[in-house]
Curated annotation (Swiss-Prot):
Keyword tags: FAD, Flavoprotein, Oxidoreductase
Residues with the S-8alpha-FAD cysteine modification: C402
Keyword Nucleotide-binding in annotation: no
EC numbers, comma separated: 1.4.3.4
Annotated gene: maoC-1
Cofactor(s), by name: FAD
Single GO molecular function: monoamine oxidase activity
Name by which UniProt lists this protein: Probable flavin-containing monoamine oxidase C
Reactions catalysed according to its record: a secondary aliphatic amine + O2 + H2O = a primary amine + an aldehyde + H2O2
Family listed: Belongs to the flavin monoamine oxidase family.
Amino acid sequence: MEIIYDTIIIGGGMSGLKTAYDLKKSNFKILVLEARNRFGGRTDSIKIGDGWVDAGGQWLGKKNPNLKQLCNELKLETYKQFYQGKTVFDIYDDGLIKSFDESSPNFDLCEIGLGYINPIIQTIKEVGKNIDFSKCSKESPIMLSLEKLTVSEWLRVCGYGESVKFFIWFCKMSVASSSDDISILFFFKYINSINGIESLFISDDDCTESDRIIGGSSMVSERIVSFLKDDCKLNCEVTLIDQISHKNGRLVKITTSKNEIYYCRNVVSTIPPMLLKNVIFKPDLPIEKQRLKNEMEMGNTIKVIVIYDSVFWRDQGYNGKSQSFVGPIYQSFDNCTNDLSVKSIIGFINGKEEIKYWYSKSLEERRSAVLNQYSKYWGPKALNPIHYIERNWSLDKYSAGCFMGVCKSGDIISQCNNYYTQPHGNIHWAGTETSTQWYGHMEGAITSSKRVVNEILKTSLKSKSKL
């Protein structure tokens, strides 16, 4: 006898699990199908002794109310990211390496030699606030003109050519793609979603990396899975979503790569747009949604975690954060657990060309380059870690990269943006790429689940009213 679910959620990352969590609390018969052999999606906490390191998404801030509320509900505690001390800046044409205390009341962009980007920040604010991404129009002159330009091209057109080097770095750090590869309209969309540009560069209590979850960000998924129990399955890669073949036309038939078949009334897909090309849809997706799956790309990042037996950088008055135009690590952070059971620094190698270059090297060559870079910042103790861990998210079959899906120059946002979330029959869409708030962040994933749950609840009420 066929089991008919109210809703099947495809994807067991944060957005999928939170969607399932809320629907189950509303007495829906739900099932989560996750393609991987683990839950968590683009979050992945690795146990190290009595502690952990996060190989995926790990930060939240005070401007992330939905994620903070969920942590409270799941009885998860957070702690402050360590920023006490000096930040290293390796961003100067003369090769000098300087350090500044970002918590100083006198600290600003001028002090570190980046005063020239202040006018650009103001321009970005002025232009960005005039774009309403919730009401994209295919005829919008400002959208069409901006989307044809990359970030680098727009800077040159506006007379800010001297800032291109900074924004090549900045885009790699914020969206894991070069400013030569993404449209300025997409950049505005991202900046608007996180409430401004400054919090991505200067670290304080208002920044995007202000707090962490004790036990690791995967604890969110673990707690939800323990609530869902048998209502979630691993190793279930969905290959077909069929809305037309079942004898009862209101049901959706879902088939996995193992030829397992499930039936439901509604589907929530949290698959990133660019990975939808691996799924057959009957009937096919509208042309705009097809463009999203075919033309969007994922950012590229290698997350490097170096574990030490002491916090020698803190002992010297540094906070473990570095900003570098040189690399291979373009940005690093203190990555210690709250109880110092694991003492580590994380760093990021971001961007398509950077990943291509560094993955042409051996693991030992990458390791040596990273440790030598750290030794220039914090001394010879950086050369002797007890563990060196890499996670190249571009090699992850079910993510195809990190941090988020990005858009090239062209017209995909102006023509297709409204189709990110528009249901296709009984298929609804969630995931951080569908969120207008905190796009690409864990908060964006949770926000998207809130929206899609409301959609499902309204659909359910309408269905009942017809009976």
